[in-house]
Every structure is written in C-alpha cells, then in structure tokens.
Amino acid sequence: MTTFHSLTVAKVEPETREAVTITFAVPQTLQTAYAFRPGQHLTLKAKLAGEELRRCYSICRRAVPGEISVAVKAIEGGRFSRYARDEIKAGMTLEVMIPQGNFGYQPQPARSGHYLAIAAGSGITPMLAIVETTLQAEPDSAFTVIYGNRSSQSMMFRQQLADLKDTYPTRLQLLSIFSQETLDSALLHGRIDGEKLHALSRSLLNFSQFDEAFICGPAAMMDDAETALVALGMPQNAIHLERFNTPGSTVRHASSVQADGQTVTLRQDGRDRAIVLSADDESILDAALRQGADLPYACKGGVCATCKCKVLRGEVSMATNYSLEPDELAAGYVLSCQSLPLTADVIVDFDAKGMA
C-alpha cells in the first residue's frame, strides 16, 4: 500500500559536515502507522526542479512517542541528499511513507543474546536504532559494534555511541576503525574487509559466539564481511545485510524478456487494475507508473524492497534482487521494479505484505 503522510520537521541536527539527522513530528493519530521495527527505513518524497524524487533513509533512533528520525548523508551528485542537508529546516512539511523494509531486529525482552553490527560510513544509521533498542529492551543481551570511517571527524553519531557506551559499559563493545587516522593499535587502522575481520578474530573476537550479525555499508565491504563471518563460524542465516546502493552504477532490468503487449493485473488496496506493457517499459513498475498507478516504490534498483509484491498467477522474470529473503522468494514475492511478465495474464498483489 502506498501510504504517504505530510509530516512536519521538528528539528534538523548536524552529525558531520555532510550528514544531518531529520526528526519528524508524528501526530497522535498516526503513531500506530509509523510504528517500526529497528532497522527499517522511511521513504521521503519531494519535487525538485519540477521532478518528483523519492529516497529511502534509515530510521536512526529508537522509538519515541510523537517523533521519528532519519539520517541523511549528502553524496556526490545526490540531488535529494544535498537538498535534505542544505534546505530542509524545522517547520517544513514533507511527504513521508510509513516505515518499510525487511532489515532489522525486533528485540525480545526475555532473550539473552550476543549480537554483532558491522558498519562503515553512513551504514551506521540503521545500526544505531537496532543497538539502542536492543540494549534497552533485552537487559541480558550484549552488542559488539565494528564501525569503520575515514577519521573520527567523519564519524556519524560519535557522541550518541559514546553515550550508549557510558550507559551500557559492560554490554556494548565499540571498535572504531579509521582508514585515514593514525592510531596506537595497527589492528584498528585500515578498512573493514575480510582480512581485517580475520585479524580481529585472532586477537580480540570470537565471531562464532554471535547469535546474529547485521552489516551495512559499501557493497564490497558487505560482501567481504559476509564471506569472512561464514568462514569464521557464523551460520549464513544469522547474517543480515542492508544495502543502500546496488554494487554497480547501472541498474539491470529484465530487458531480455519480450513483454510488449502483455497484460498484468495489479491488485492494490483490494482493487484490481489491468495494465498493458510496451516495448519501452523496463519493468512492471515502470509500466504501471506510466499508466498512472500509484504504487509504492523508492530506489528502483532492487535494493529497498518498497515495491515488493506477490505473484498470484503466472510467471515473471526478476533481473536483480538485493533485498528479498529466500523464504520470500519461495513464497512468490518479487520486486516490481526489476520484474517483467513471462506468461500471459499475470496477477501481482501489492497488498500482500505479511512477510515484511
């Protein structure tokens, strides 16, 4: 379901020279709609130079009644991120979709777990909400955070992490690794990669002891970290990844599929609508938007899963998937931004969000 609401910006706080935290006020009538699992994201919508842009940003703080916060780091060529950093101010209103996303962890107060977070740069944003919420909700659990940055000056949430360490001195272990800052310990200098994790395992950490691991950052770091954790004894199904970007600069679509003239039925908000694909349509989502459908989407790159739907009839080809879990694929879920029909009379259901 595509559900945007106009939310007022309560405050904008600088985190580094390039990053800000934007906190939205959530009225009492919408607090249930904006309840979230730590690790999820919000999709923000704005018109810039006459063009509607949508971008996903991770929720970066634990749940607090009446507000919800995301962090935005301005990137080179990032129209929306630079707009967010430079122009969004307290008192403005923005269109904000209700929380989405598969990534994250829902704490269980009776659980006693040892969790690992590996983040680089802005990859810390979903981790902060997960770590803060888990340590508060699970009094017998502990968290180890490995956080990579160029330097301490580029480190997002430096003070918040220090405060968490002060609050949970025996339950939070924070390892900061800097690539461009000289440190006393060579172990904490460099980049987070497979070699670094293996070095940490030899002298500091037993990775096989962790019950769950959460990874977010550049694609190469994430892939290296995942491979290393499996080699160091962590089960594959205990490792959870959140990708902000696709590994390549060019989004791949199911372009080899000949879908010109195919009909697809969209089920949304309990209603069916038929669309007809043309040769120019790169995906079901592309065709639907061209024909005026108001479907949920954000990245269009197979990363955020905002456009997830379930195939009820027929078969589709999905070119790229960086977000759906194996059980979702087995249940028939696809990303509409990456899918084209293979058979006639395909039906896809955008109301089927039960596995999110």
Where are these regions (language model features)?
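Iron-sulfur (Fe-S) cluster-binding segments and ferredoxin-like electron-carrier domains
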Residues: 289-291, 296, 306-355
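Iron-sulfur (Fe-S) cluster-binding modules
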Residues: 1-2, 8, 14, 18, ...
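FNR/FR-type flavoprotein reductase catalytic core
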Residues: 83-257, 263-265
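Short acidic, glycine-rich loop/turn motifs
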Residues: 26, 46-48, 266-270, 311, ...
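A short, sequence-level motif marking secondary-structure junctions
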Residues: 38-40, 60-63, 278-284, 323-324, ...
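Ferredoxin-reductase
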Residues: 2-93, 97, 110-113, 149-151, ...
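C-terminal accessory/binding modules appended to enzymatic or scaffolding proteins
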Residues: 260-296
